[in-house]
A protein has these predicted regions:
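C-terminal catalytic subdomain
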Residues: 290-307
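Conserved phosphate- and dinucleotide-binding cores of soluble alpha/beta proteins
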Residues: 146, 154-241
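Short internal beta-strands
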Residues: 95-105, 237, 307
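An acidic, phosphate/nucleotide-engaging active-site surface
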Residues: 109-178
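Membrane-embedded hairpin module used as a gating/binding unit in multi-pass transport
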Residues: 210-288
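Short glycine-rich or small-residue beta-strand-to-loop segments that form or flank ligand, phosphate
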Residues: 62-73, 98-104, 281-283
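Glycine-rich phosphate/diphosphate-binding loops that line cofactor/substrate pockets in enzymes
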Residues: 48-64, 89-95, 271-279
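N-terminal amphipathic/basic leader segments beginning at the initiator methionine
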Residues: 1-44
Length: 307
C-alpha cells in the first residue's frame, strides 16, 4: 500500500507492506465553496452579531486588519482584497488602513515571504503592511491585568484603530482548543510579557488546555478576557480542507463569529477511532505548518490520545 502524507510543499510517499495491519485514519470530506471569492463577499454582507463590513466602516477614519504570520495557511489573498476594497468604498483613506502581521513572538515576515503571505500585490501597494514586534515596549499599550493577573499589553496600531478586524483560520489547537478569532489578538499582537505569562506552565499544563476544548480551557478564557478589554471588534474566520481549499468563511463580532466557525469545523476535526495503536505515522500537514520545529510539534501531539 502506498500513501502520500502532506510534507513541505509537496508530499512524502509512504510504502506500507501488505502483511502489516494498517488502519488509515482520515477526517470526513469537507464541503467546498464553489466560488470562494463570492463566499467572502457574501460573508462580509451577512454578519454574525454585527453589521455588514460596509456599515461598520462607514464614518470611521482608520482600520487595522490582523493577519496570521507565515506559519498559518490562511487564504489572505482571497480575504484581504475584498476587505480593503470595502473599507476604501466606505470612505477610508488608504494611508489609514493597516494590515498588521500577527507574529506573536515569531520572527517578522519580510520580502518574498511577505508577498507570499499577503497573497495579492494590489494590497501591498495600496495599504500599509507591517509586522508586529512583541519585544518593542514603546509599540504597545498597557491595558491593565486580567482577573487571573495576566498583564495585557497590545500593539498600539491595533488598539488605536477605529475599526479592528482579525482574520484567521479556525482549526483544532493543542493549547487553545481552536485557533483563530481571539487568538490572533493574543498572542498574535501581544507584548512578550503577555505572551510569556499565559504560555506558562500555569496555563499550558491545565488538563483542559487541549485540542478541541473551549469550555474550562484557561488559555481560551484568558483570551476572551483580553478581547473584552478592547471592546467591539470584528473577525473574518476561515476553515480550509487538507488541500488548502476554502470550506467555510464567516464574518462578524469576533467572539460570536468564531464560535460559529468552531461549530462548523468540529464536525470534521474529530474522528472516532475506538482503539490504540503501537505506531502512528503522521505529519504536520505540510507547508507552512511544518516550516518550523515548533509548528511541527503539532503533528506529534495530535495522535497522542491513540498511542
Amino acid at each position: 500500500m502506498r500513501l502520500d502524507l502532506n510534507y513541505g510543499r509537496d508530499s512524502y510517499p509512504l510504502e506500507l507492506r501488505d502483511d502489516w495491519d494498517v488502519t488509515v485514519i482520515r477526517k470526513p470530506a469537507m464541503p467546498l465553496q464553489p466560488d470562494p471569492s463570492l463566499a467572502v463577499r457574501n460573508a462580509l454582507a451577512q454578519p454574525v452579531g454585527a453589521s455588514s463590513l460596509a456599515n461598520e466602516a462607514r464614518g470611521l477614519k482608520s482600520a487595522c486588519i490582523l493577519i496570521c504570520d507565515i506559519t498559518r495557511p490562511v487564504p489572505n489573498g482571497l480575504l484581504l482584497p475584498e476587505i480593503v476594497r470595502q473599507l476604501l468604498d466606505a470612505g477610508m483613506n488608504p494611508d489609514d488602513i493597516t494590515v498588521l502581521v500577527a507574529t506573536g513572538l515569531h520572527r517578522p515576515n519580510e520580502g518574498a515571504e511577505l508577498e507570499e503571505l499577503v497573497g495579492d500585490p494590489w494590497v501591498l501597494k495600496t495599504v500599509r503592511v507591517v509586522n508586529h514586534f512583541a519585544r518593542d515596549d514603546a509599540a504597545h499599550v498597557d491595558l491593565g491585568r486580567t482577573p487571573r493577573g495576566t498583564p495585557v499589553k497590545l500593539d498600539r496600531r491595533f488598539v488605536d484603530a477605529d475599526l479592528k478586524i482579525a482574520t484567521g483560520l479556525v482549526e483544532p489547537h493543542f493549547m487553545a482548543g481552536y485557533s483563530g478569532g481571539r487568538k490572533v489578538i493574543a498572542p498574535g499582537v501581544a507584548h512578550r510579557d503577555t505572551i510569556t505569562t499565559f504560555h506558562s506552565a500555569r496555563f499550558m499544563a491545565h488538563p483542559k488546555a487541549d485540542n478541541c476544548i473551549l469550555e474550562g480551557n484557561p488559555l481560551h478564557e484568558e483570551q476572551l478576557e483580553i478581547v473584552r478589554m478592547l471592546g467591539h471588534m470584528l473577525a473574518v474566520n476561515t476553515v480550509i480542507d487538507e488541500h488548502r481549499r476554502l470550506s467555510f468563511v464567516n464574518y462578524g463580532e469576533i467572539i460570536a463569529s468564531h464560535l460559529q466557525a468552531v461549530e462548523f469545523t468540529q464536525r470534521y476535526a474529530r474522528v472516532p477511532v475506538g482503539r490504540r495503536f503501537k505506531t502512528v505515522v503522521t505529519s504536520a500537514a505540510g507547508y507552512p505548518l511544518d516550516k518550523t520545529y515548533y509548528q511541527t510539534v503539532k503533528g506529534m501531539v495530535g495522535p497522542v490520545d491513540i498511542l
